[in-house]
Amino acid sequence: MSMTAQEFESLMPDGGRLLSDEPEMESSLHYAQLALLVSCLEWHWRERDDFFIGANLTVYYSRDQLRHREFRGPDLFLVKNTRRRPRNSWVVWEEGGRYPDLIVELLSDSTAGSDRGPKKRLYQDHFRTPEYFWFHPETLELAGFRLDDGVYKPILG
């Protein structure tokens, strides 16, 4: 059975009440790298008001995710062509079914396996996020991928 975005939205909780469910940052270096990324993007697009940058915020995308708390949000994500306003989280069903256009994960020893495996597959197969990058602030490992015909192809790394 398929349903429209409006039917799906009517089944979901009010997004204004869904606060981000993200854990604390891994380290002060992790925080500094994330702050630098956000600052650079906001400065680069300082005269625009048609984007949203989420940092350490949950992306709510399904009822199962809400019920099982099975997914932690990206370290950083960007959504283009949307209204720039404060949000407590990104709630897909209240944003017209929109998923992030860009995701960046900052790797750590405790998250690298998930960021390179299950999260990459989720961003590719479910979110269909056009570009995905990861960076390890300690080892300086950098990799980037662009969605091409439904599959991430390396563009960096």
What are these regions (language model features)?
Residues 1-157:
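Gly/Pro/Ser/Thr-rich low-complexity, intrinsically disordered segments predominantly at protein N-termini
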